[in-house]
A protein has these predicted regions:
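Glycine-/small-residue-rich "gating" segment that lines the acyl/pantetheine channel
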Residues: 1, 142-165
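Acyl-CoA/ACP chain-elongation machinery
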Residues: 1, 10-27, 59-69, 86-144
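Condensing-enzyme catalytic core mediating Claisen C-C bond formation in acyl metabolism
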Residues: 1-49, 55-56, 185-234
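Short glycine-aspartate micro-motif
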Residues: 4, 56, 126, 170-174, ...
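A beta-strand-loop signature enriched in Asp, Gly, Thr, and Trp
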Residues: 39-58, 68-98
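Short, well-ordered loop/turn and helix-capping segments at boundaries between secondary-structure elements
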Residues: 80-81, 114-124, 186-192
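Conserved phosphate/anionic-ligand binding catalytic regions in large, soluble enzymes, centered on
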Residues: 101-107, 174-184
Length: 234
């Protein structure tokens, strides 16, 4: 099967209050316990990723008084705790500007969006952003873009390869009702390829890559045929 990304770290947390209101707290800060020696940092290091390699965070950003400051503070505080260099921007994808309120499926869209970022190297615009809440000025790492921004190499809209290094990693959080938080760090699929090559050799990697690319091409053909009415999509 093709690999769209590698889970570098995943965990769920609770704040302890467990009050069922849509004002998530900061329980996911526990991902940074230990700072530069936290499990988050150590797990990513096994895949060759440092805190400064994390390029983007995909957040809900509900435009509510409770969510936006909390979620932004969470990621900015974590960035400092795990040793991200001062001045290294952490670009933000505000999920709900792209899909609206997806309810329980929101973080699935966020994770899928990160895999698309690995493929394209382009951060989507927060198109509906008129101004950033002044409360977020304290969060010095966080950057919201209003236009698509290419930050790495990948495929353009015509499938052509563009120059640049791949985007190594991104974060996604799901801060839900009841003060229960989900946190995932996703790593570029190149980490999977490196693991296959190390374990089974370059020949095995090329064999997998050939099968995976054939499956991707077949899926794309099927999608386009369905869009043109030449085949049933489902």
């Amino acid at each position: 099967l093709p690999v769209a990304g590698v889970i570098g770290f995943v965990h769920s947390y609770a704040d302890g209050a467990h009050t069922s209101i849509p004002a998530p707290g900061l329980g996911a800060l526990a991902a940074g316990m230990g700072g530069k020696d936290s499990k988050l940092v150590r797990d990513l290091a096994r895949l060759g990723v440092t805190p400064d390699d994390i390029a983007v965070v995909s957040k809900h950003d509900t435009s509510t008084n409770a969510n936006d400051p909390n979620e932004s503070e969470l990621h900015n505080t974590l960035a400092h705790a795990i040793g991200r260099a001062d001045g290294n921007p952490l670009f933000v994808i505000s999920q709900k500007t792209l899909t609206g309120h997806a309810k329980g499926g929101a973080c699935i869209f966020q994770v899928n969006g990160l895999t698309q970022l690995f493929k394209s190297g382009v951060i989507p615009a927060n198109a509906a952003l008129d101004c950033v809440d002044p409360k977020l000025q304290r969060d010095d790492h966080m950057v919201w873009v209003r236009k698509p921004l290419r930050i790495g190499g990948g495929e353009d809209e015509f499938g052509r390869e563009t120059a640049g290094r791949p985007v190594k990693a991104g974060l996604a959080t799901s801060l839900g009702f009841g003060h229960v938080s989900g946190f995932v760090a996703l790593v570029h699929p190149g980490a999977f390829e490196a693991a296959v090559a190390k374990a089974d050799g370059e020949a095995a990697l090329e064999a997998w890559r050939e099968r995976a690319n054939a499956r991707l091409a077949a899926g794309q053909r099927h999608l386009e045929e369905g869009m043109m009415g030449r085949a049933a999509l489902y």
